Amino acid sequence: MLMCRRWLVCSLRCHYRSFSFSAARRTVMPAWVIDKYGKNDVLRFTKNAALPIIHYPNEVVVKVHAAGLNPIDISMRGGYGAATMAMKRDPLNISQSGGEFPLILGRDVSGEIMECGLDVKYFKPGDQVWAAIPPWKQGSLAEFVVVSGNEVSHKPKSLRHDEAASIPYVAATAWSAIVNTGGLNKDNSAKKRVLILGGSGGVGTFAIQMVKAWGAHVTVTCSQNAERLVRDLGADDVVDYTAGPVEKQLKNLEKFDLILDSIGGETEKWALDLLKPWSGAKFVTLITPFLQNTDRLGLADGMMQSAVTVGCKVVKNLRKGVHYRWGFFAPSGSALDEVSEMVDAGKVRPVVEEVFSFAQVPEAFQKVEQGHARGKTVVSIMEDQKE
């Protein structure tokens, strides 16, 4: 009987704790939103954005302390991937066209858990966390955001929130491309040769540190003025793309086990020749036509066109003894758990180029849109809310 009563009391307390935030909170919050796709002038600040609520028992509400911006935010502002994102948000097409608006951008979040769904076991209100938010969900340029429990992870203890917000999206992207698609991990990377095309941006600066921490030899392409940065992060060889044709410079080096391409364009016409043939070597590109195809042709035809395109390239390169793959962002709290350990162990550090205030979100977008990044652009949100 005593055990039963303890279980009942515990259950009631857990139930109350999980939803205590809902009972007393407001129904609106400050946020930056867009009401249509376009250029920077579509960004609008509002104090009346709908405050997010838990819809599924595995979700958590996070109070945003800092948000990170990524090139995907610039693309999404202009409508890139709208067809695919709409399908992910509304698989049955119940909502009318434009049902995603007002849309909140921002893929990185670092903050504090305020509320947990009933199935969330590893987090509690008050936990300091970070997460990479999938593009089909409402983003982090707001006071609060809802994420799934399997997307969130405890923030590294050694980082401030504005530092932590620079890592999750690029870490999840690099992890998906290098580990899930490329096949490298901490146990098999020693002495492997890795080439990172475009090493000074967000994904590149993280990928350098991760594979270097795993014992790989890292070669990076970047401009001359980014060489010091990438060498400080662990790059062994640096190729300056402003000093002449990159492919000619790279052909003078030993061949590679893995190439991570964050540049796209003409690179895949010559980069696969830099791989070690018949050794399982892989070329993984993050620049794919998948979302462009679905936007242009519709979901079904776009997916078919993408399958044909990648299939032809896979077969063509298999004949040469190398593997061609597309890499994609994949949210993963478990991957961020491992990254958090690497950060606290001093093996990975944040690379923040500039921090903007919440009032400066349009300026932050302009900074990312200019390109030639030397790390990440971050928006500090919690400090503005205190004022």
From Swiss-Prot:
Q: Where are the transmembrane segments?
A: none
Known catalytic reactions: a 3-demethylubiquinone + NADH + 2 H(+) = a 3-demethylubiquinol + NAD(+); a 3-demethylubiquinone + NADPH + 2 H(+) = a 3-demethylubiquinol + NADP(+); 3-demethylubiquinone-10 + NADH + 2 H(+) = 3-demethylubiquinol-10 + NAD(+); 3-demethylubiquinone-10 + NADPH + 2 H(+) = 3-demethylubiquinol-10 + NADP(+)
- The kind of enzyme this is, by top-level EC class, is oxidoreductase
Quick one: a GO biological-process term for this protein? regulation of dendrite development
Q: State a single Pfam family of this protein.
A: ADH_zinc_N_2
**What PANTHER family does its record include?**
ALCOHOL DEHYDROGENASE RELATED (PTHR11695), RETICULON-4-INTERACTING PROTEIN 1, MITOCHONDRIAL (PTHR11695:SF294)
Physiological role = NAD(P)H oxidoreductase involved in the ubiquinone biosynthetic pathway. Required for the O-methyltransferase activity of COQ3. Able to catalyze the oxidoreduction of 3-demethylubiquinone into 3-demethylubiquinol in vitro. However, it is unclear if 3-demethylubiquinone constitutes a substrate in vivo. May also play a role in the regulation of retinal ganglion cell (RGC) neurite outgrowth, and hence in the development of the inner retina and optic nerve.
Q: Tell me what this protein is called.
A: NAD(P)H oxidoreductase RTN4IP1, mitochondrial
Native organism = Danio rerio
Q: Which gene encodes it?
A: rtn4ip1
